[in-house]
Curated annotation (Swiss-Prot):
This protein's name: E3 ubiquitin-protein ligase DTX3L
Function: E3 ubiquitin-protein ligase which, in association with ADP-ribosyltransferase PARP9, plays a role in DNA damage repair and in interferon-mediated antiviral responses. Monoubiquitinates several histones, including histone H2A, H2B, H3 and H4. In response to DNA damage, mediates monoubiquitination of 'Lys-91' of histone H4 (H4K91ub1). The exact role of H4K91ub1 in DNA damage response is still unclear but it may function as a licensing signal for additional histone H4 post-translational modifications such as H4 'Lys-20' methylation (H4K20me).
Keyword list, A-Z: Acetylation, Antiviral defense, Chromatin regulator, Cytoplasm, DNA damage, DNA repair, Endosome, Immunity, Innate immunity, Lysosome, Membrane, Metal-binding, Nucleus, Phosphoprotein, Protein transport, Transferase, Transport, Ubl conjugation, Ubl conjugation pathway, Zinc, Zinc-finger
Catalytic activity: S-ubiquitinyl-[E2 ubiquitin-conjugating enzyme]-L-cysteine + [acceptor protein]-L-lysine = [E2 ubiquitin-conjugating enzyme]-L-cysteine + N(6)-ubiquitinyl-[acceptor protein]-L-lysine
Single Gene Ontology MF annotation: histone H4K91 ubiquitin ligase activity
Basic and acidic residues compositional bias, start-end: 209-219, 227-236
Gene: Dtx3l
Membrane topology: Peripheral membrane protein
Alphabetical list of SMART domains matching this protein: RING (SM00184)
The record's account of how the chain is modified after translation: Autoubiquitinated.
Pathway(s): Protein modification; protein ubiquitination
Residues recorded as bearing N-acetylalanine in the entry: A2
Domain of life according to the entry: Eukaryota
Amino acid sequence: MASSPDPPSPLLVRLRESIPKAHRKLEIYFQSRASGGGECSVQPVGPSAPDTYEVKFLKKADKEKVLKKSEHEMLVHNKPVTIVLETTKKPVEDLRPRLPSLTQPVETPSSRPPSLTGSLDEALCDDIHPQDGLVSNSVDSVVQKIFLAVTAELNCDLLSKEQRASITTVCPHIIKSMEGSDGIKKVCGNFKDIEKIHHFLSEQLLEREQKRKGSEQKRKCAPQKHTPPDVEREPPDQSSIQVPVLLLEYFKHVNPGRLEFIEYKFGVNIEIQASSPNMVTVGFTSSPFGNVEEASQSFVRDFQKCSQSLKQDCISLEEHQRAKEVRQELSRCFPKLLIKGQGRTLTLLGSPADISAATEKVSQGLGLRPVKITASGYTTGIEVDSTRFKLLEPELLQEISEIEQKFNTRGKVQEKGQKTCILFVPKDKDLDLSVQSYTGFTDAFQRATWQLRTEVLSLKGLGKERARLHNTKFADNFKKEHPNVHFVTSQESVTLTGLPHHLAQAMQYVSKRMGLAPSSGEKLAMDQETPMEISSSDPHGDQQENAALPAPRGTSSSPAASKGTEDYCVICMDTISNKHVLPKCKHEFCTSCISKAMLIKPVCPVCLTSYGIQKGNQPEGTMSYSTQKGSLPGYEGCGTIVINYEIKDGIQTKEHPNPGKAYHGTRRTAYLPDNTEGRKVLDLLHEAFKHRLTFTIGYSRATGVSDVITWNDIHHKTSKFGGPANFGYPDPDYLKRVKEELKAKGIE
């Protein structure tokens, strides 16, 4: 009679470290000649014994040959992994993992078996001694008295929402201490209820694992004895996706840690390998309890959402160091922009709005490089007449304060005898705008000088009062009361010079004490016999070394002095020659002075009234516009005007910096709200483009490249979003500012 086949002979083995698909790799190893084994199957023991596996040999002799070999190890990714054999002391009839009990007595170091086999035998064997049951029952009763209530936090990553919801069916009176949109997270109850829930959920997990193992067994192909023993088989439970390397870098840049989260959530390992010069393969390999299909689907959804509507652009700079500086600045301003550097070239990848704002920021150079302006002509400051400065001091000090705030400088006023020096020092060493400060002060000084007025009080008919007027005490008191009014006396009159509001107070002071009345309706002239001079040492203007003050524009004078009337030009700071009166504002200048000034800028130097539209040197190009239904931030309720500028490549002419040299064209896009004010600004911008004022050819401070198309001091919104820092909206004052910029060029 034929003998029955041997029952499967099990062997417990343990790995020193966790590896993916370990049971498949062990199965291959124990069927190879290197192990001495033969036909077998391998299954993990379960959660109670991590990294421990049951090897069932079809032949007991194969198991014996494996046990005779003292050391076992296999290669995983060219790395040796040690396999430890656990020899059992008694036959293992049922290797299914027991459900762990919360009331099981805690094992102490003294009672722990000397090897892992003993503990596994106790955990896996169904034979329990009667005395163990008595101990367990006694412990249950004691524990029940010790713990009045127990709170347990559920593993939401391991248990589905439906499995956690079924808890209320098992224990209806359990308390759900924490429940959110994704289900129950914490439960509270007595010790027995918590233990009951623990057993129930453990059974659910074991059933799911057994179903998965059963489906794997069905997918097995030919008998394993026909498989070449020394060849490691590729695990079938894996997936791979090929994507562009640059898009994957962008995905990891804007979603840091997302790949690690997918690995943790779905129990997979993700490996990235280059497959071609511009492509990479994202591989998904499942762990014992992982789900490759759901992991790959989750990655595809996230990747497509992240990479849609992306735009790529390149920026070339003049030197490698400059490229590094620009890259750091753009990375700070646009955190969701991927910036790749190669030499002097930067590659930008991101949303169209970020790309547009970044390229605009580079082209305008705002915040990217310290602006260095040489103030060689102002190293010692500006010197003005001390006496004149005293007359204008209140207004000039206020102007200096505003200039300090506007240009981030610190003004210093130093009196040096007959001259007063005004010096501006930058507060920020990297941004020197002292030249602009000096220009602003010069304009303010000229405007204030134009406001100076002179009043002449006649002394005819006075007796004793005239002697009192020439008294030193009177002059000292006058200077103390009115330090910003110049006071000069002669035998026939008293001359007062100052700003209108200071002058009115001084005249009241003199009239009250001397009983005088000012002459009216006539301009003051310089007295031919006694020139009006302002002395820094003589309070009466006597025959001492004086600093001459050019005659200011007067409101009244004596008849005797009217013949010598000479007006004052604020441009050359001298007496007007060949007078020219501007038609709109009626300000007067030397003809030669105002002609030169109008060639530079057709506005009045005093009040900035426009006298014509400026002409620019913008190259040939086109300007067009269209409208969109979408609104801009801050202008909800109206559409959007889209302006498109195009300047083609060309050759510079004599009105450009380098005639005969080529320049590259450009395309720019700007946005305005489609409302009444926006359409008005559109008309003004169109007028500026017609007069060639929108663009110019010059040096770009941002890129360091010469002979390029740049904006010409008329600001445009080149992005819909991002605010003023990114040349976008919302910016409630933009339309007002751009109209002022256009007005300064004569367009209004």
